[in-house]
């Protein structure tokens, strides 16, 4: 037996404030405007599926890396294979484990073409946009499944200094420090540094020590210069080095359907050093915007 249940949907009016002149003032919710060299539009007018995170979202949910995004963004999956060198991303089930990635990553309009660079620690992130579905028409290679677009905070827009400390079990601790200052009204810089370590979450029965430890650290410099009302220049350079022990693998017994203990005496490690830089030049005209990015 099929039936229907009628329901009534009602809208809640927006409260108005009347000023001294009798004018009615309405306070509306903020509208997020997406702006990059590819397109400019209101977030809800973007012709596709997109997830947007701002600085407040990242701090509230303790998002500290690209892998952490997949815990809250629907249809995005970034498995943790143990090493930062292996960071495969999947959107709607489409991705690549071995070859060129099917999900693109851009940081300040600079493409990260190799997925071995995807896993890095966040600091001073302004926003993250996850575009789902093919983006090759605008972004070209490595975007068959979608795109992750990351923007960092501009020192021209926000100044100050802060230090962030984190602690946990298994000797997990980290520190991050950043400062953003204006030298003039039109020139500003930001400098940050970060370090994080842990001793691993598994024990090697052979050595009687923890296995899978991680040590990573790096820094970032950004210079923003508003030359005049038409021209704007932005330069950024970022370095991150990471040193990880070999991932703690163990044998699997098909008969007992049980994973064995971790026990080996072979020394193994992963070492990764990444340096990225980018220079963005922007010309603002009354009728158009010209942007050139070199990275």
Language-model features: where?
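Transmembrane beta-barrel wall of Gram-negative outer-membrane proteins
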Residues: 160, 167-198, 206-244, 275
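Flexible loop and strand-edge segments within Gram-negative outer membrane beta-barrel domains
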Residues: 232, 236-275
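Outer-membrane beta-barrel translocator domains and adjoining extracellular loop/strand segments
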Residues: 118, 201-209, 246-253
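N-terminal periplasmic "start-of-domain" segments of outer-membrane beta-barrel proteins
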Residues: 25-59, 87-88
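Extracytoplasmic beta-strand/coil segments of soluble accessory domains associated
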Residues: 67-110
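Extracytoplasmic loops and strand-loop junctions of Gram-negative outer membrane beta-barrel proteins
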Residues: 130-131, 159-162, 202-207, 258-265
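N-terminal periplasmic accessory domains that precede
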Residues: 66-69, 88-93, 106, 130, ...
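Short acidic/polar hinge/loop motifs at secondary-structure boundaries
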Residues: 108-134
């Amino acid at each position: 037996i099929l039936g229907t249940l009628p329901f009534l949907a009602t809208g809640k009016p927006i409260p108005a404030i009347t000023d001294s002149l009798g004018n009615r003032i309405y306070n509306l919710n903020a509208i997020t405007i997406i702006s990059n060299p590819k397109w400019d539009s209101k977030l809800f007018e973007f012709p596709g599926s997109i997830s947007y995170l701002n600085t407040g979202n990242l701090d509230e949910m303790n998002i500290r890396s690209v892998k952490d995004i997949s815990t809250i963004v629907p249809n995005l999956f970034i498995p943790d294979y143990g090493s930062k060198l292996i960071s495969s991303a999947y959107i709607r089930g489409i991705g690549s484990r071995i070859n060129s990635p099917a999900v693109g990553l851009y940081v300040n309009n600079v493409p990260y073409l190799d997925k071995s660079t995807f896993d890095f620690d966040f600091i001073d992130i302004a926003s993250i946009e996850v575009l789902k579905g093919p983006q090759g028409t605008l972004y070209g290679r490595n975007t068959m499944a979608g795109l992750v677009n990351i923007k960092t905070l501009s020192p021209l827009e926000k100044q100050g200094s802060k230090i962030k400390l984190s602690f946990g079990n298994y000797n997990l601790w980290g520190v991050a420090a950043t400062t953003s200052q204006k030298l003039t009204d039109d020139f500003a810089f930001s400098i940050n540094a970060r370090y994080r370590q842990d001793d691993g979450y598994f024990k090697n029965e052979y050595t009687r020590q923890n296995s899978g430890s991680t040590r990573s650290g790096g820094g970032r410099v950004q210079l923003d210069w508003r030359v005049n009302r038409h021209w704007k220049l932005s330069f950024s350079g970022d370095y991150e080095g990471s040193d990880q022990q070999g991932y703690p693998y163990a044998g699997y017994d098909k008969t007992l359907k049980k994973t064995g203990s971790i026990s080996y005496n072979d020394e193994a490690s992963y070492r990764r050093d990444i340096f990225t830089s980018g220079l963005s030049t922007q010309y603002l005209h009354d009728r158009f915007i010209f942007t050139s990015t070199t990275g």
